Amino acid sequence: TNPEWVIDTNVLISAALSARGAPGRLVQLVLERSALVFSQPTFDELKTRLYRPKFDPYISLELREAVLHDLSAAARWVEIGEPSRYCRDRNDDMFIETALAAQVGVLVSGDQDLLQAPAIPGLRILNPQQALAEALA
C-alpha cells in the first residue's frame, strides 16, 4: 500500500456525501492507514466546490466545515508552483503537480482527462475502484 495519496476534488466530495461507495471507503482507509496530500490550490478547489449550493440537500454546512477541518488537519501539505501542462483541462494539472511535488506514486481521480493523461514517469493515475482494491490489498 502507498503511504500517501493525492485524491482529486470530485472523489473527496463523493466521499463526503456518502461513506458507502468506493470513494468514501478509500478516503476512510487513507485517513486510517496512511496520509492524504494537499497543496493550497487543490485544497482551495475542494473548499470552493464543497460549498456549492447544489450540495445543500445532501450535506450540512457544519458537516462541510468538519470534513474540511479533518482533511486539512490529517494532510501533508506541499508547495507547488505554476503547474506544467499535462491535461486537456488545465484545472487538473495541479493534482499531477501536487503528486509529483509530494513524490507519491498514485493520484486518484474519476476525471477522464486525468485518467487519460499521457504517462508521467513515477506516477500512476487510478480511478477510485482501482485505488480501493490496491489500498485493501
Regions found by a protein language model. Name each.
Residues 8-9, 39, 110-111, 128:
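A secondary-structure boundary/capping signal
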Residues 1-38:
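Short, well-structured N-terminal submotif of metal-dependent ribonuclease cores
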Residues 15-16, 49, 58, 117, ...:
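Residues that scaffold the ATP/ADP-binding catalytic core of kinase and kinase-like folds
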Residues 28-82:
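PIN-domain endoribonuclease scaffold, especially VapC-family toxins
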Residues 13-15, 55-57, 82-88:
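Short, flexible loop segments at the rims of nucleotide/cofactor-binding pockets, characterized by
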Residues 21, 37, 59-62, 86-91, ...:
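Residues at secondary-structure transition points
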Residues 100-106, 112-137:
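Acidic, PIN/NYN-like endoribonuclease modules and their adjacent C-terminal/linker elements
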Residues 72-106, 112:
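Active-site neighborhoods of divalent-metal-dependent phosphate/nucleic-acid chemistry enzymes
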